[in-house]
């Protein structure tokens, strides 16, 4: 009896992201992902079950990668303001391909109520609270909101932003940060 081939979930997730990047969120289906990954529909279903399971896996992988990037920039005792500052510096990295991938994943995330609710809860926990009562906290939060807004404008193609313009925007946003919020 032959051994069943093992499907690389990460390659299937990459194929799903490519489908969304190339064709839009409405094209995301088990069939399209299977075609892009070069496997059967059953292969995709055996990895993720349903389209919702596929989307959830896309978002979870992206979140884990993003959180690892942020945590790598932080000291073990970092607080919420340092966490936001690290995210601002990650957002400032001019990487058009990464922006497109993030936009694809965000579009997938926005297609599911449960994932949108998780994002809402995450942002609320990140941006509200006692740390933002001080002037320093307010400046860090404002810089984070500006960086996130610029990132969304660029990633979703709402505004074409050249590398030089992105650098200028990032420098402007960095000036919003308090002097003690150095680049991690």
Language-model region placement:
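N-terminal intrinsically disordered/low-complexity leader segments
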Residues: 1-7, 181-184
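Pocket-edge positions in alpha/beta enzyme catalytic cores
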Residues: 4, 75, 158-161
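Solvent-exposed, amphipathic alpha-helical segments
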Residues: 15-23, 69, 146-153
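Hydrophobic alpha-helical connector segments
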Residues: 57, 64-103
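Short secondary-structure transition hinges
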Residues: 85-132
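Hydrophobic/aromatic-rich alpha-helical bundle segments in the mid-to-C-terminal region
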Residues: 114-120, 124-184
